Structures are given as structure tokens and as C-alpha cells.
Design a protein with these regions (language model features):
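Catalytic cores of large soluble enzymes that bind and process phosphate-bearing ligands
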Residues: 41-44, 57-58, 134, 138, ...
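Extracellular Cys-Trp
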Residues: 80-89, 303-307, 317-403
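Glutamate identity and glutamate-enriched acidic tracts
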Residues: 21, 62, 87-90, 111, ...
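Extended, beta-strand-rich, solvent-exposed assembly scaffolds of outer structural proteins
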Residues: 48-57, 109-330, 387-393
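General N-terminal targeting signals
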Residues: 63, 69, 288, 330-332
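Bacterial flagellar/type III secretion structural subunits and associated motility module proteins
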Residues: 94-126, 140-148, 152, 328-367
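Extended assembly-interface regions of large multimeric machines
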Residues: 1-120, 139-164, 300-314
């Protein structure tokens, strides 16, 4: 006689009685947005579609998503309890200070505001000795006046007497598969580093250097993002290389704007080469060639706008590399009238480097695990979607990823 397998091997039934009015747990959803309105590091909970529309704006993508989310399933016994939303800085994020709402302030009252205003952005104090909004014809016009005043005298951080900038180029470079080779006979100017986009010859659009091989900036091998075969050609790397020399003072750092000589506008230091604050090489954001000259580094200008959704002034760091970006609440006699202090309802969001699912998602869970499913507001790349799925597969079925 063939023996049977006990049913308990497959299922273990635990008898229990549900309360007569039990409705079960609410399965909240988590939405990752690449918009910048949610402060970095915060997970906001919204109880309704209308609350999402109020915070993000009625025409926002977040509001459209929430309208579908809270509609739920027709005739379902239970609808979603809340929608959690957090900012995923896909390409990094600059720091910002958003004031409390002044939407109800009459224009005449706005025009009466004057005084001092100080904001520490990216580690440097921006001071406006005499903000005067008497000529402002709108809230946006007032924002423009504040921006001009805060950027009128930018702190000079570093100086040099003999610095130069060259483009990043190399001759006779080849690519085989995912390996870029800059041979020993190549003429190299500037430096090549991970993160640079390279062009030249038949190189495919969007090809970036992803890592060092034997090369450390010049001759040698590097890995690239797109597999391809390219015969010997001259390549150019994005950005340029700044060499700080001569008599050097102060501390040169990522996020500062380089000025002097024939330097192009908005040239920012985006990486360190051999320079670690003084003489040496640095990577800058704009491709250009500048002959030896007296160059300086100064605090990067801020942007000031009027946010019509929140009805508040928004001060944003101009630093291109989010991780080097920071901001604090404002001070001075005009700060409170402009609602730019913590006491008047202002909020801050600090800068952030580009996020990865492997490090971002654990930080969210550490803050709250009151959600069951998660998705992105944008269409992720295949590699990005796989990275989210890979993280989710290690969570012991706690969450579901909706790609």
C-alpha cells in the first residue's frame, strides 16, 4: 500500500475568529518621485488625492498618480489608507530653502519689506546688506530682487597667480568591447575619469567612462558603459582640467565657481585630481582652454524664485554636484517677514549625490516600513529597474516592486 504525505507537510492551519467589524490592515503604497519638492531624506504620508494635489500642484504628475491610486478598485471593500511619497535623487539634487507661505500677503505689504538677509549656502554666508522690495511689481519680481542682492558680492574662497584650463583629449585611443585603451604613444591633455562622457570617431552616443583599469587619468585602460569596437581615434572627455598653480591661497573645493582670465561663465569645480584644496589639478564642468592666468574660486551663485504652488520664496544652491550642496535657514531683519526662518514655517532640503536602489531603499525602510508596494513615478532604465528588483528580492517577501 502506498503511504500518503500528511497534509500538514504543505499547510498548517491556525484556527481563529475575525472580529465582526474587522477590515484587515491597510496596504499603503510608496511612490518614488524624481521631482524635487519633497525634502531629501523625508517620506511624506498623504491621506487623499486632494492632499497630494495641494502639496505638489493640481497639474503635477504626483497628483495624477494619486488620483488613480486613491480611486482603488471599483466595489472593493477597502480602499488605500495613505500614499507615501519620497524624493529619489536619480541624478543628484541641489540643496534648497523653501519659505513659509506668503501667498495671502498683499503686494503693498510685500513692497514694504526691507532689511538685511543672510543665508549660508554650500558652507558660505551670502549676505544682502539692504534688501528693498519697494519696486517689486509681483512676487516673482521680488524673488529676482532678492537673488540679485544675495549674489551681489560672492565670497572669494581661493586665489592663484598662474592657473590654466585644458580640454580632456587623447589621440590613438581604441575601444574593444567595454575596454577603452589610451596607448603609450598617445598625446594626452587633461585627465580622464569615471563619469565623463567621451566622444570622437565612431564612439556611440552616451558612452561614459565607468571605471579605472590600468589608467589613472592618462595612459592606460578604462571601462566604458557601452560595448563597441572603435579603431584608433582622437577622443574628448566631457568637462576640462584646471591646473591651479603659482601663488595659491585659500581652499579650492568641489562646488566652487572658477573666475578670472577668459574662464567661461558658470564653470564649476566638479571633481578633485591631484589638487586637494591647494595647488594641483581639478575637474571643471565646462570644456574650454584657458592660458595661464590669475584665477580665483568663489561661492557659486544661488537662484531665488517664487514657488506658486506653495506660495513661498525658494532659494536653491547653484552647485552642480549635489553632494557638495547644503543650506541653512535665513537670518537678518528681512528673514522673518519673508518667511524664510524655521519659526515662520520654512523648510530645508540638503544636497544629495545620485541615488542607487541598494543604498536608498534601506534608508527608506529605516524611516518607515508602513507600506507594502512601491514604484517609481518615472520610467526607469532596464538596469535601474533590475537594481530595484534585486534589492526587493532580498527582503523576504516584505514588499512588492511594481516596475
Amino acid at each position: 500500500m502506498t503511504s500518503s504525505i500528511p497534509a500538514s507537510y504543505f499547510v498548517n492551519v491556525q484556527p481563529s475568529v475575525l472580529a465582526a467589524e474587522s477590515t484587515g490592515p491597510a496596504l499603503n503604497g510608496l511612490l518614488l518621485t524624481n521631482g524635487t519638492r519633497v525634502p531629501i531624506g523625508q517620506v511624506l504620508s498623504f491621506p487623499s488625492a486632494s492632499s497630494v494635489a495641494t502639496y505638489f500642484g493640481a497639474s503635477s504628475s504626483e497628483a495624477a498618480f494619486a488620483a488613480q491610486y486613491f480611486a482603488g478598485v471599483t466595489n472593493a471593500s477597502q480602499q488605500p489608507g495613505a500614499l507615501l511619497i519620497t524624493q529619489y535623487p536619480e541624478t543628484g539634487a541641489a540643496a534648497w530653502l523653501r519659505g513659509g507661505s506668503i501667498a495671502s500677503l498683499p503686494l503693498t505689504s510685500l513692497q514694504a519689506i526691507s532689511g538685511t538677509l543672510n543665508v549660508t549656502v554650500d558652507g558660505y554666508v551670502r549676505s544682502a546688506a539692504s534688501v528693498n522690495l519697494s519696486t517689486a511689481t509681483s512676487f516673482s519680481a521680488a524673488a529676482a530682487i532678492i537673488q540679485t542682492d544675495l549674489n551681489a558680492t560672492l565670497p572669494v574662497i581661493g586665489t592663484s597667480t598662474a592657473s590654466s584650463i585644458v580640454t580632456n583629449t587623447a589621440t590613438q585611443a581604441t575601444i574593444s568591447g567595454n575596454i577603452l585603451t589610451i596607448p603609450s604613444g598617445s598625446t594626452v591633455t587633461g585627465m580622464f575619469i569615471p563619469g565623463q562622457t567621451i566622444t570622437g570617431g565612431t564612439i556611440l552616443a552616451g558612452t561614459t567612462i565607468t571605471g579605472f583599469g590600468t589608467g589613472t587619468g592618462g595612459i592606460g585602460t578604462y571601462t566604458v558603459s557601452v560595448s563597441q569596437n572603435v579603431s584608433a581615434t582622437t577622443i574628448t572627455g566631457s568637462g576640462a582640467t584646471l591646473t591651479v598653480g603659482g601663488t595659491v591661497t585659500g581652499t579650492w573645493a568641489i562646488g566652487q565657481t572658477v573666475t578670472g582670465g577668459s574662464v567661461a561663465a558658470n564653470t564649476q569645480i566638479i571633481g578633485l585630481g591631484t589638487g586637494k584644496g591647494g595647488a594641483g589639478t581639478y575637474f571643471v564642468s565646462v570644456a574650454q582652454t584657458v592660458s595661464s592666468a590669475a584665477l580665483s574660486s568663489e561661492a557659486t551663485p544661488v537662484a531665488v524664485t517664487y514657488d506658486t504652488v506653495s506660495g513661498a520664496f525658494l532659494i536653491t544652491s547653484g552647485v552642480a554636484i549635489g553632494a557638495a550642496s547644503s543650506i541653512a535657514f535665513a537670518s537678518g531683519t528681512a528673514a522673518a517677514p519673508l518667511m524664510l526662518t524655521q519659526a515662520t514655517g520654512a523648510v530645508t532640503s540638503q544636497g544629495a549625490a545620485p541615488a542607487t536602489p541598494a543604498t536608498f531603499m534601506p534608508a527608506v525602510v529605516a524611516q518607515t516600513s508602513n507600506w507594502a508596494t512601491f514604484t517609481t513615478l518615472w520610467e526607469p532604465s532596464i538596469s535601474e529597474a533590475l537594481a530595484f528588483a534585486a534589492w526587493n528580492s532580498l527582503q523576504n517577501n516584505l514588499f512588492a516592486y511594481l516596475a
